[in-house]
């Protein structure tokens, strides 16, 4: 429950299209990492802080060929998921700090994808 990801709508189709266009999928993984790295500081800033600040300290960026990922929590911070997404049975309201951070930085990380798409399209013969 501690590792959560926010996926962009249409990301799967985007990856399929880029693969068909001959895009370097390792390069797409790097673009995904840069996008996650852009949103990470905002997620850290928005994370609720208690006495220790362990939740904010557990936030990290990652990437696959399919998505950039911001993870919060680990074994020593198992409450990250309930704090971000809520837990109705325990009367914990969602804080959505990771989701809000990704949404608020969209204009910045979207430029990374735009640059990647333009570069890939320029490499396609006849485009």
Model-found features: residue ranges?
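Short, Lys/Arg-rich flexible segments
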Residues: 1-77, 81-127
